[in-house]
Amino acid sequence: MKTPWKVLLGLLGLAALITIITVPVVLLNKGNDAAADSRRTYTLTDYLKNTFRVKFYSLRWVSDHDYLYKQDNNILLFNAEYGNSSIFLENSTFDEFEHSINDYSVSPDGQFILLEYNYVKQWRHSYTASYDIYDLNKRQLITEEKIPNNTQWITWSPEGHKLAYVWKNDVYVKNEPNSSSHRITWTGEENAIYNGIADWVYEEEIFSAYSALWWSPKGTFLAYAQFNDTQVPLIEYSFYSDESLQYPMTMRIPYPKAGAANPTVKLFVIKTDNLNPNTNATSVEITPPAAMLTGDYYLCDVTWANEERISLQWLRRIQNYSVMDIRDYNNSTGKWISSAAQEHIEMSTTGWVGRFRPAEPHFTSDGRNFYKIISNEDGYKHICRFQIDKKDCTFITKGAWEVIGIEALTTDYLYYISNEYKGMPGGRNLYKIQLNDYTKVACLSCELKPERCQYYSVSFSKEAKYYQLRCSGPGLPLYTLHRSSNDEELRVLEDNSALDKMLQEVQMPSKKLDFIILNETKFWYQMILPPHFDTSKKYPLLIDVYAGPCSQKADAIFRLNWATYLASTENIIVASFDGRGSGYQGDKIMHAVNRRLGTFEVEDQIEAARQFSKMGFVDDKRIAIWGWSYGGYVTSMVLGAGSGVFKCGIAVAPVSRWEYYDSVYTERYMGLPTPQDNLDYYKNSTVMSRAENFKQVEYLLIHGTADDNVHFQQSAQISKALVDAGVDFQAMWYTDEDHGIASGPAHQHIYTHMSHFIKQCFSLP
């Protein structure tokens, strides 16, 4: 379960947004300045119309020293060291195509470019599209042996220009762009058998991707997963489409709910060098380790260590036990050989393995060692070095902070992102550690621009000779290019200076990032504070909540969103709090909600609101809460708790009963809804059981009728329970909208409607 995608924007330094990271409440722009400030505020229209547009710099590395960047619809090739560019593909080249190009992908050898058009979105990551291949040497389209329309996924091999694609749930390989395709699988069937692509639950909850294809580093082998959903129950819902449609369409998706039959999975590998168009290709299955065969299991990661060594991670349905199985190719038999010494077990005794799944391994170039993020004995996620045939590993990082991700591995260094700097869980910085001396660690971003940039991500060139640093806040996004040998900044790629100048004329809110201590534990929060914030005044407070396991809402990212409008124009404080169950602060906090969803994370939001109301600047008669998805669930549970703290709240696309949500996500945290396992906590964590307490609050319930993720059923049952209890409440549905309610008209309508509700609740004009 994830929150709907929202545009993330930022502001330069103190000119547009002030971020305070401190323990005591800090006074900002106090008092008398407000009357003299004639600048306009950031309005709801500004948010809905995206009046202030941030610039991004999305490059694509094509080698260790060159990258592509699209500018004025020309695709330019840049040299990283010197910054000079040449036209890789002119805008005029696209004029000869019959279709509008949605995206492109260049073959690793630079000879061909794959052009995508007719894009049709399916679920969160999945889509279908049509493709043409352009020969860059001949400067012409390849017209023979074209890729079929409505292709579900396509990818180049890591070297050369082989192609693997999925069409009608079957896998195909092209060894040359202009040659005929080799059909690899023959079993594909809609809503039943998926080859090379994920079914709904694997796409949403395990791979976070549609692809289930994995090329070996040189393209000799192709691994692919097969999912069998024939026993998975279908979710069915109406899709109303145009008003001229007399009978609505019925959408059907194999969707395993908690405790229901899951898809089964198999993993195959095929050698692509010897494909013969006259004979069917032979795929070799790699079966799971014996420890997985005692019950249901998931395939959760596939990583190639080298050309003839593959790592598979398998996870039991009760997600506290996983096995990483490293297999080697036997040339004489064509089989992938297992060894007990090359099986690595990862377990959790306090919750589940990993943050959402076991982390992927990062292998050394010889494939003999790998680095992986796992929990240490203190429950913090850190990097451990493994030898492939040894059970124990050596931690190379440590501390009361967490490694977020391994970003690059070279002969001498490992690069990673962590939140170590200044003990702030909501920050992100880039570090490198010397592999022959783990005590030699350097932060490459911490002191570059600490006022503007405290939240970084990174993109490395093919062999990590260069990297792009991407600063997401608290100031405006800043993109810089660096040389790895000395970490020197070579140039600024984008600094959003034009936007900063525009925002000088707007009264922008400030952001406070701080913590409170509850039961001797630090819990972080953020507040978006109105312009000219004055601690002697009383402001209405809106809690913006998500609160799902391993979530984080208090961070150093700058956003231009609905909260910006509420603070700037309506003088509402918008706060978020990371309580028990939240992520990136150790397993003790994250696993507190294990098998207990709907308890501590709900209680902590209520307690946070109480603590905020004691700070002196919150009007305790005007406190509201709102959230989307898991946040909608927590909002509803909070309002149904009868605490007397909240006047009103908004729940968008909420879960209402955990048996209604998908198996992978729900069972990770709750186990199975059976009397032998955790049925009592399933029953005690429903919104409907709290219906009577909604008489004490004002409640707005919102859902899209075509939500494939959190089904409309969830809100329908809340509505039914409230009606049965005689509760007066407001509700809004959005016809044919999915979980994001993101189409243009619906997006504008929902935020306008919610704004009216909040203003009415707070008695604002």
Curated annotation (Swiss-Prot):
**What protein name does the entry list?**
Dipeptidyl peptidase 4
Q: Which GO terms describe its molecular function?
A: aminopeptidase activity; dipeptidyl-peptidase activity; protease binding; protein homodimerization activity; serine-type endopeptidase activity; signaling receptor binding
* Activity control summary: Inhibited by GPC3 and diprotin A.
Q: Quaternary structure per UniProt? A: Monomer. Homodimer. Heterodimer with Seprase (FAP). Requires homodimerization for optimal dipeptidyl peptidase activity and T-cell costimulation. Found in a membrane raft complex, at least composed of BCL10, CARD11, DPP4 and IKBKB. Associates with collagen. Interacts with PTPRC; the interaction is enhanced in an interleukin-12-dependent manner in activated lymphocytes. Interacts (extracellular domain) with ADA; does not inhibit its dipeptidyl peptidase activity. Interacts with CAV1 (via the N-terminus); the interaction is direct.
Organism ancestry? Eukaryota, Metazoa, Chordata, Craniata, Vertebrata
UniProt lists the gene as: DPP4
**Function description:** Cell surface glycoprotein receptor involved in the costimulatory signal essential for T-cell receptor (TCR)-mediated T-cell activation. Acts as a positive regulator of T-cell coactivation, by binding at least ADA, CAV1, IGF2R, and PTPRC. Its binding to CAV1 and CARD11 induces T-cell proliferation and NF-kappa-B activation in a T-cell receptor/CD3-dependent manner. Its interaction with ADA also regulates lymphocyte-epithelial cell adhesion.
Q: What PANTHER family does the record tag this protein with?
A: DIPEPTIDYL PEPTIDASE 4, PROTEASE FAMILY S9B,C DIPEPTIDYL-PEPTIDASE IV-RELATED
Predominantly, its location class is membrane
Which Pfam family, just one, is annotated for this protein?
DPPIV_rep
Could you tell me which residue ranges are on the Cytoplasmic side of the membrane?
1-6
Disulfides per UniProt: 384-393, 443-446, 453-471, 648-761
The protein's annotated catalytic reaction(s) are: Release of an N-terminal dipeptide, Xaa-Yaa-|-Zaa-, from a polypeptide, preferentially when Yaa is Pro, provided Zaa is neither Pro nor hydroxyproline
BP term (GO), one: endothelial cell migration
Transmembrane spans: 7-29
